[in-house]
C-alpha cells in the first residue's frame, strides 16, 4: 500500500519507521528534508491514503491552506482540541472530507519505543469499518492495531489524557506519593469519560487502550511531555520556560483551555481540568492538587 505522512516530528517519524515495514510510505515536512522517502507536499497529496501528524493547533489553518480532496482517506494521528474554534479535530477534518473517509489513531504509544520496534498496541477508530481495517492492516507485527468505531471517544480520550498527565506530573513533582497519583488517575479517567459521554462517546472506550491505556502511560513517565510540564510546574518553574526547555509541543497546555471553554458551554463538571487550568494561570500547585484529593463526591 502507498501512503503519505504529513508531519515529521517524533511521532510522524516513528510512524514512518513502523509503517514502512509493510508499505511504501512517503513523508513530507517543512523542516526535515533528509528523511528517507521525503517528497514534496504536492506529491503526498496525489496519494489516496494519508496520515496527518501535525500539531493540533496547526491542523485547522493547514487544511484551509491545503484543502484535501473529497476522495482522500485520512488517519488522524494528532491528539488535541482546536483551541481557537473549540472544536474536536474530527469536526475540523469533516469540513474537508466525508466522515466515512476519516479514521483516528489512539492508544498508548510513545514515539521513542515505536522507533525501536518495541511491542505496542493501538486502536484505529472509524465509522467506516472497511477503512479502519485497511489502516489497521498497514501496521507491522510489533504494532498491533485494533479496530473500533467510537471516533469521538478515541479522539477525546487522546486529547484529555494530556491534561490529566499534567496533573499527574504536578502530583509527582510535589512528592505526594503513589497513593495520591493512583487516586488522581482514577478520578481523571472518570472525568474524561464524563466529558466525552456528553458528546456521544462510549464508556468502554475509556476502559481500553484509547482511554485507560493511554492515560496510564502518559501520566506516569518522563517520556511524556505533558507529564514533564507538570513536574516543572510543581517546582515553581515558569510555564514558558518549561515549554522552551521541552523544545516540543505539549498539547495538554492548549487542550485544557479548550476543555474549560467547552465544559462551561455545556455545563460539564471537570474539576481536574479546572485545577490544571488555574495552575497554568498562576495558582499554587500544591493547594490545587491537595484540594482535588480532599474534595467530597463520587467523581
Swiss-Prot record:
Gene Ontology cellular component terms for the protein in this record: cytosol
Positions that bind sn-glycerol 3-phosphate: 79, 107, 109, 161, 214, 224-226
An example Gene Ontology molecular-function term: NAD binding
Predominant subcellular localization, coarse grouping: cytoplasm
EC number: 1.1.1.94
Locations listed in the record: Cytoplasm
Enzyme class: oxidoreductase
Key words of the record: Cytoplasm, Lipid biosynthesis, Lipid metabolism, NAD, NADP, Nucleotide-binding, Oxidoreductase, Phospholipid biosynthesis, Phospholipid metabolism
Active-site residues, as the UniProt record annotates them: 161
Reaction equations catalysed: sn-glycerol 3-phosphate + NAD(+) = dihydroxyacetone phosphate + NADH + H(+); sn-glycerol 3-phosphate + NADP(+) = dihydroxyacetone phosphate + NADPH + H(+)
Function in brief: Catalyzes the reduction of the glycolytic intermediate dihydroxyacetone phosphate (DHAP) to sn-glycerol 3-phosphate (G3P), the key precursor for phospholipid synthesis.
Assigned protein family: Belongs to the NAD-dependent glycerol-3-phosphate dehydrogenase family.
Name of protein: Glycerol-3-phosphate dehydrogenase [NAD(P)+]
Organism of origin: Nitratiruptor sp. (strain SB155-2)
Lineage start: Bacteria, Pseudomonadati, Campylobacterota, Epsilonproteobacteria, Nautiliales
Amino acid at each position: 500500500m502507498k501512503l503519505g505522512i504529513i508531519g515529521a516530528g517524533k511521532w510522524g517519524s516513528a510512524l514512518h519507521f513502523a509503517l514502512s515495514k509493510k508499505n511504501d510510505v512517503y513523508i513530507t515536512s517543512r523542516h526535515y528534508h533528509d528523511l528517507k522517502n521525503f517528497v514534496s507536499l504536492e506529491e503526498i497529496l496525489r496519494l489516496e491514503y494519508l496520515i496527518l501528524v501535525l500539531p493540533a493547533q496547526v491542523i485547522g489553518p493547514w487544511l484551509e491552506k491545503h484543502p484535501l480532496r473529497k476522495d482522500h482517506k485520512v488517519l488522524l494521528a494528532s491528539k488535541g482540541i482546536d483551541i481557537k474554534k473549540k472544536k474536536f479535530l474530527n469536526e475540523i477534518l469533516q469540513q474537508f472530507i466525508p466522515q466515512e473517509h476519516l479514521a483516528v489513531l489512539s492508544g498508548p504509544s510513545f514515539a521513542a519505543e515505536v522507533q525501536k520496534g518495541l511491542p505496542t498496541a493501538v486502536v484505529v477508530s472509524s465509522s467506516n469499518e472497511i477503512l479502519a481495517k485497511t489502516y489497521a492492516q498497514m501496521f507491522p507485527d510489533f504494532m498491533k492495531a485494533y479496530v473500533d468505531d467510537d471516533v469521538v471517544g478515541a479522539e477525546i480520550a487522546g486529547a484529555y489524557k494530556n491534561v490529566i498527565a499534567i496533573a499527574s506530573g504536578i502530583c509527582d513533582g510535589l512528592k505526594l506519593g503513589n497513593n495520591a497519583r493512583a487516586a488522581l488517575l482514577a478520578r481523571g479517567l472518570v472525568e474524561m469519560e464524563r466529558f466525552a459521554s456528553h458528546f456521544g462517546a462510549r464508556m468502554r472506550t475509556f476502559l481500553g487502550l484509547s482511554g485507560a491505556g493511554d492515560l496510564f502511560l502518559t501520566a506516569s513517565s518522563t517520556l511524556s511531555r505533558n507529564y514533564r510540564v507538570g513536574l516543572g510546574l510543581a517546582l515553581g518553574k515558569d510555564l514558558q520556560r518549561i515549554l522552551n526547555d521541552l523544545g516540543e509541543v505539549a498539547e495538554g497546555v492548549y487542550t485544557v483551555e479548550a476543555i474549560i471553554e467547552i465544559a462551561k458551554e455545556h455545563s460539564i463538571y471537570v474539576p481536574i481540568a479546572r485545577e490544571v487550568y488555574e495552575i497554568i494561570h498562576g495558582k499554587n500547585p500544591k493547594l490545587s492538587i491537595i484540594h482535588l484529593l480532599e474534595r467530597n463526591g463520587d467523581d
